[in-house]
């Protein structure tokens, strides 16, 4: 039975990764709105820590490396930040599985999902924004200046993901839990 469970989880992980990449490409022309993060989090929440991390790393690598708007392979520190962030998102979903993967979703769960969406996106945005000035050797004041110059863009991304997590995850979890 163990091999059957492993195969089932492999297929589910592949489906989550494919969904994350497809939704990433489908929405890439809409600024500040993306569904990769929520799909990776759901993979961790549904399949556990290891599979969530695998889905996060694989889906972000495929999305970034093959992005028609510009491949992340051109700048290794950026793609490393993107992949690391999504691995962490999958890990977070998996580690919170015992607490949040329940059929009965309360208002506290909804708030927690929204908060997690905001915080995980903040981490992603921070790591990706800081990847360039740090790798390019900017000094600390220049690095802070570059980081602050992107806050308008990143805060909208964080708010939109907070809303997406709060609205979307409860609807999905009640069918998967």
Residue spans of the language-model regions?
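Interfacial aromatic-anchored transmembrane helix boundaries in multi-pass membrane proteins
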Residues: 21-35, 58-99
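Hydrophobic alpha-helical transmembrane segments
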Residues: 10-15, 38, 53-57, 79-84, ...
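Hydrophobic transmembrane alpha-helices
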Residues: 1-54
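Short glycine/serine/threonine-biased micro-segments
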Residues: 22, 42, 46, 50, ...
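Small-residue faces within membrane-embedded alpha-helices
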Residues: 13, 17, 21, 52, ...
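Membrane-embedded alpha-helical hairpins and interfacial helices in multi-pass inner-membrane proteins
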Residues: 29, 34, 71-77, 97-177
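Hydrophobic transmembrane alpha-helices of multi-pass, membrane-embedded glycosylation machinery
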Residues: 38-40, 61-62, 171-173
């Amino acid at each position: 039975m163990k091999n059957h469970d492993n195969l089932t989880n492999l297929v589910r992980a592949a489906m989550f990764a494919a969904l994350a990449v497809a939704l990433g490409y489908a929405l890439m022309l809409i600024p500040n709105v993306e569904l990769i993060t929520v799909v990776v989090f759901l993979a961790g929440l549904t399949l556990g820590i290891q599979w969530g991390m695998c889905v996060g790393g694989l889906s972000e690598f495929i999305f970034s490396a093959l992005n028609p708007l510009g491949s992340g392979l051109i700048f290794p520190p950026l793609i490393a930040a993107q992949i690391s962030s999504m691995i962490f998102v999958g890990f977070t979903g998996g580690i919170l599985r015992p607490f949040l993967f329940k059929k009965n979703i309360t208002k506290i769960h909804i708030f927690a999902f929204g908060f997690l969406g905001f915080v995980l996106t903040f981490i992603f945005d921070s790591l990706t924004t800081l990847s360039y000035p740090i790798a390019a050797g900017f000094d600390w004041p220049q690095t802070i200046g570059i980081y602050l110059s992107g806050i308008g863009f990143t805060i909208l991304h964080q708010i939109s993901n907070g809303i997406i997590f709060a609205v979307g995850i409860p609807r999905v979890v009640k069918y998967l839990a």
